[in-house]
């Protein structure tokens, strides 16, 4: 059994993917070009946004978002502590201060009341992570921020394809970012990501920054990075994008089976207004150590997303005295189960059996 069965996915689309790879290899056009342009247009159409910009990873997408907003020294950016490190890492990389706040245990996303309490005159942005594939009510969060000159950024690394009240993840915030890491709902065969916005000037600046700050060849207006999405990944992702909604439907069905059959754990709590992309299927278990022993004895893969909240990480030691009870509880009790659109009925039953004792 695989935690995420990427091989089965490849075999399902093998002929199309191989043809696209061969097309790129034959063209000898590996950076930029029509394949990348086509993918970006398809992304924008899928979300209903004006601008979709392919980039080298979800991390570079977040970094470029902050750079495009001129966030830096003496600025503060509010982030959740229960998330992958990239969300806060990029804040530190641009010279700003990450301000860690707690989450709701219902959806593992930002606690909006905690966000309100954390706002200071130095707050320039809030990065809202759509954890495990479920969005928060970003319109409600926008309402909190709108009169304070604070920009909302969605970290939709895990939620591409999700929606809230019919509005898709990565289509609402001033700038939204996603990841195409292989395990994500829309995954590449390597690293990749994208940035989404409706603002022409922000889009223009991001495109300059991700290409070493060049406004024309060898003329560098800004200190930028190599943040480009390569053409080969764009071609592969373009194939997978066609099947995303079909895969999302399968994720819903598999999640419903887990929901109906898992015992002795807290299953994901999905808001009635939300459609989750179920990037992971994660549960809370009271005695995680004993459950993990059962998984290991049965040779069933699992993951812990995430074992240490960011304010307890060594690289953020200056925040170690913070008490963020929900983030700490989640890190101690969270467990991600084998899950992908290609999880078989037999494999899922093996996982369910672990929780029956």
Question: How does the language model describe each region?
Answer:
Residues 106-188, 196, 336:
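Active-site phosphate-binding strand-loop segment of PLP-dependent enzymes
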Residues 97-107, 303:
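Short beta-strand->loop structural element characteristic of the AMP-binding/adenylate-forming
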Residues 83-88:
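Conserved coil-to-alpha-helix start sites within the AMP-binding
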Residues 7, 36-42, 46-52, 113, ...:
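PLP-dependent aminotransferase class I/II
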Residues 1-29, 34, 298, 338:
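N-terminal "arm"/small-domain region of PLP-dependent enzymes with the aminotransferase-like
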Residues 73, 79, 100, 152-154, ...:
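Hydrophobic residues in well-ordered beta-strands that form the structural core
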Residues 28-76, 90-94, 100-102, 167:
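Phosphate-binding glycine-rich loop
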Residues 94, 147-148, 298:
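Helix C-cap/helix->beta junction micro-motif
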């Amino acid at each position: 059994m695989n935690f995420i069965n990427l091989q089965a996915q490849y075999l399902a689309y093998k002929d199309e993917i191989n043809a696209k790879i061969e097309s790129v290899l034959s063209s000898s056009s590996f950076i930029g070009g029509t394949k990348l342009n086509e993918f970006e247009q398809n992304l924008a159409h899928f979300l209903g946004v004006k601008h979709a910009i392919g980039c080298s990873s979800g991390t570079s997408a977040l970094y470029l978002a902050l750079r495009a907003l001129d966030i830096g020294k003496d600025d503060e950016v509010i982030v959740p502590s229960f998330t992958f490190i990239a969300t806060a890492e990029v804040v530190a990389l641009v010279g700003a201060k990450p301000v860690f706040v707690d989450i709701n245990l219902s959806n593992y996303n930002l606690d909006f009341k905690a966000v309100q309490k954390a706002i200071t005159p130095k707050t320039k942005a809030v990065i809202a992570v759509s954890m495990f594939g479920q969005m928060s009510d970003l319109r409600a969060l926008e309402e909190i921020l709108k009169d304070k000159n604070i920009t909302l950024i969605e970290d939709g690394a895990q939620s591409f394809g999700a929606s809230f009240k019919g509005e898709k993840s990565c289509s609402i915030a001033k700038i939204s970012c996603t990841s195409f890491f292989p395990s994500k709902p829309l995954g590449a065969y390597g690293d990749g990501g994208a940035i989404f916005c409706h603002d022409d000037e922000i889009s223009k600046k991001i495109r300059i920054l991700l290409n070493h700050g060049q406004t024309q060849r060898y003329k560098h207006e800004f200190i930028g990075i190599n943040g480009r999405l390569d053409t080969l990944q764009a071609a592969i992702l373009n194939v997978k994008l066609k099947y995303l909604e079909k895969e999302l439907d399968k994720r819903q069905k598999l999640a419903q089976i887990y929901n109906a059959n898992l015992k002795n754990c807290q299953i994901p709590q999905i808001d009635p207004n939300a459609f989750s992309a179920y990037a992971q299927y994660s549960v809370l278990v009271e005695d995680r150590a004993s459950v993990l022993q059962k998984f290991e004895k049965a040779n069933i893969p699992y993951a812990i997303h995430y074992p240490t909240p960011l304010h307890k990480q060594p690289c953020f030691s200056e925040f170690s005295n913070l008490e963020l009870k929900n983030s700490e509880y989640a890190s101690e009790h969270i467990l991600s189960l084998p899950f992908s659109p290609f999880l078989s009925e037999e494999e899922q039953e093996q996982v369910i059996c672990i929780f029956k004792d």
